């Protein structure tokens, strides 16, 4: 395998696992389930909460920075950035980012309306009421504040929450001419500046809509691509260090969650940096040693899983919880793991059926070229 193929396949190998990690994080973020006005508090399940802290320490916040880095690297890879190139790439991103973003948020709005109008709404502790408004409709595509259901939510995410990454990526892509111009003149200083803003932004309690993380990692990837940096060489130098740091910081984050919770934010940011190097180095190592290879189907399904899982995972979790009624940490953990497997399985099946019987529809909703 050539170095170019190894670099490309190392990125492709990461796509599906990263999507599953995002799904897992979103499912395990649900630490209490309300049914018929009664909320189950999972603090009563100590082993389950320890597993949750482990997932927080090792996986939360890791996937999207890697996605951003890959996006920045690929955007500028192997092309001369002329006016015609930008126009072509912008047109492509309309198909691969903007159209799916609009469609999947519309799906979320429709699902919200169906949920509010369904008979099950009356079993909620505080039944929602559909209150249509232009402001509420538009907020669903940027930062949804609950207007469509007559409530107030302080949030930085669109209605289909995982799509914040796509929203931010659209904005970053629009800035790529300026990013290219600045990188050509400032080189890595722009990367360092954006890295500092990302690293220290929590100290200032400013709502960034997560644009800090998107810009930093996209620009970092763009810098390496524009300057023809070989990731196999640059990241490979830190293989052992990244493994040690990633594991050590994950453990430290779990311990800090118990004893020094104020430090978890800084620890997590350092671990995100180590995690990026670790993930790419591990992917390249697995391929180079023939331990695994890229599954084209899973890699191509990763974006579909990412944009769609938020619409069904929470509902599947609630159904599974109500059906099983777990009475211990182990049984609760079994419920959560089962929901991850069921959700991934259903979405892969849906992707397969769409690819086989409605490929044109899949191209539109999944941003496939």
Language model segments and positions:
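Kinked, hydrophobic transmembrane alpha-helices enriched for aromatic residues
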Residues: 6-42, 63-75, 95-116, 171, ...
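Perimembrane loop-to-helix junctions flanking transmembrane segments
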Residues: 37-53
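Interfacial loop-to-helix transition and helix-capping segments at the boundaries
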Residues: 52-65, 153-168, 201-219, 253-278
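Structural signal for the C-terminal ends of transmembrane alpha-helices
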Residues: 75-83, 116, 177-185, 201, ...
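Membrane-interface helix-loop-helix regions
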Residues: 97-168
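Solvent-exposed interhelical
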Residues: 170-195, 206, 223-241
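Alpha-helical transmembrane segments and terminal signal-anchor/GPI-anchor hydrophobic tails
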Residues: 219, 226-297, 301-304, 311-336
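Membrane-proximal cytoplasmic C-terminal regulatory module of class A 7TM GPCRs
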Residues: 356-369
